[in-house]
């Protein structure tokens, strides 16, 4: 009996081995860093000193990373992510200070301002064809002056004094503070579920929704997407609006974590906004994103920062070593991709 031959076209594609899976690599790196810092400083696992504050920071900066991820999906950049957060925080603070708005109304107002700023940037980019880097950088400079002017006009200094009812609890409380009889919740800050909702929402958007898929197709090849009937300009506006909305949410979370709506909200957002998604596997050229990878990238960044801080590194040293460690991580990730390609498996 003649034996059937299997041609290359008939063979199933090579499966990605565990060692070449980028998410597995990030999890292994995260576990290794936690083990290292715990060995060097056992206080790293102290709940109140390290774990709860670190969870709050991860919650804030995961949303910051998602804000940048929204436009990286197009191959664009949002250089104004920090200033959009500051403007959103100002709007929330103003609504409470002048109109005595409750927490949810103040939050909604801030998110609306962030989304409008993002949509404005997206509209300019889609209509003029000017590079997103240039447009959002110009917007960033404009908002720097506007934020300072607005805070100087509407506050006594650089921050609103009061907070909406319930916002202080977001800063100080964990689920362990709420009990049903003798059963109390875990030591997880109240900020975490808000960030989790954002993570799930963005993940579902890009995974299952038509809009998310069309944004990714636009990022992969805008001309081909337009020829296939996708409203490319509208998708650009929507992606930038989402970026602004998430920046606004991050500004609100940081304000809650800091205990005030201040002009300095968002000052340190730009670098982390790129580090988390890129470390997590999101492509700078567009067309592919990783929401889970962004969360893992954020966790790795914050673990490094907290660990080095416990080891009493100075601020400049912290920046240096965080940069070196992340550069090494990105280089190893690239090496893994090259090795995977040589073995004939998709990276």
Predicted regions, residues:
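Cytosolic-side transmembrane-helix boundaries in multi-pass membrane proteins
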Residues: 1-35, 39, 220, 227-234, ...
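Alpha-helical transmembrane segments within multi-pass membrane transporters and channels
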Residues: 100-141, 297-300
């Amino acid at each position: 009996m003649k034996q059937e031959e299997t041609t290359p076209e008939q063979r199933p594609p090579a499966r990605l081995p565990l060692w070449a899976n980028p998410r597995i690599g990030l999890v292994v790196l995260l576990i290794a860093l936690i083990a290292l810092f715990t060995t060097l400083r056992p206080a790293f696992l102290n709940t109140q000193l390290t774990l709860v504050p670190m969870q709050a920071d991860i919650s804030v900066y995961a949303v910051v990373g998602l804000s940048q991820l929204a436009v990286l999906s197009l191959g664009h950049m949002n250089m104004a992510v920090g200033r959009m957060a500051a403007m959103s925080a100002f709007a929330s603070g103003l609504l409470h200070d002048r109109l005595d708005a409750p927490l949810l109304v103040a939050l909604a107002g801030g998110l609306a301002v962030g989304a409008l700023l993002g949509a404005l940037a997206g509209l300019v980019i889609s209509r003029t064809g000017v590079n997103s880097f240039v447009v959002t950088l110009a917007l960033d400079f404009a908002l720097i002056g506007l934020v300072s002017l607005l805070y100087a006009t509407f506050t006594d200094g650089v921050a609103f004094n009061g907070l909406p009812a319930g916002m202080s609890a977001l800063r100080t409380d964990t689920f362990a503070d709420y009990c049903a009889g003798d059963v109390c919740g875990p030591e997880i800050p109240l900020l975490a579920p808000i960030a989790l909702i954002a993570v799930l929402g963005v993940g579902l958007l890009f995974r299952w929704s038509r809009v998310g898929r069309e944004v990714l197709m636009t990022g992969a090849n805008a001309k081909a997407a337009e020829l296939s009937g996708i409203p490319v300009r509208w998708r650009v506006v929507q992606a930038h609006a989402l970026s602004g909305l998430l920046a606004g949410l991050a500004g609100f979370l940081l304000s809650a974590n800091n205990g005030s709506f201040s002009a300095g909200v968002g000052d340190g957002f730009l670098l982390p906004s790129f580090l988390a998604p890129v470390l997590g596997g999101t492509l700078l050229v567009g067309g592919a994103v990783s929401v889970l990878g962004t969360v893992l990238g954020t966790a790795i960044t914050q673990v490094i920062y907290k660990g080095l801080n416990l080891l009493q590194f100075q601020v400049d040293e912290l920046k240096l070593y965080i940069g070196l460690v992340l550069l090494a991580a990105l280089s190893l990730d690239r090496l893994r991709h090259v090795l995977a390609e040589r073995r004939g498996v998709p990276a």
